[in-house]
Amino acid sequence: ETFFKTQLVFWLLAAIDGHAKNFSLFIEPESAYRMTPLYDVISAFPLMAKGSLPPARIKMAMSLKGRSRHYHWSRMLTRHFLSTAKAAGFSPKRATAIMQETAANTDSVIESVSALLPTEFPDKVAGPIFAGLREQAQKLLSGQKTF
């Protein structure tokens, strides 16, 4: 479930370099382990905003599953997320709930992150990321079959 949520958040962020190496484990005493926080997650929204990277050319590092693998960010569809969830062993109902919950929480997450940013943090970076997140989340909330 965490992996699915992460792929969804990578898509929301247009974090095109989100790949398996972003996932690490802490090895703890007595053969226990837990996931580390994600790291090296970079959004392409600032590059799209200044016209350096056309959305149609963006490919994600990890694909979604469908009849084939889907890497193109702008062509990822609701059904691809649902197929990926099914392949990971959980129901389309749960996947849909995760998508809706994540999208519904986007504004509050943006507010929290915005409050943590230093005042000198460049708006040319934060602005496009926040706007892009809101736009992608709205697509999920509206129930669009295609994005």
Region spans (language model):
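Anionic ligand-binding catalytic core segments
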Residues: 1-20, 24-147
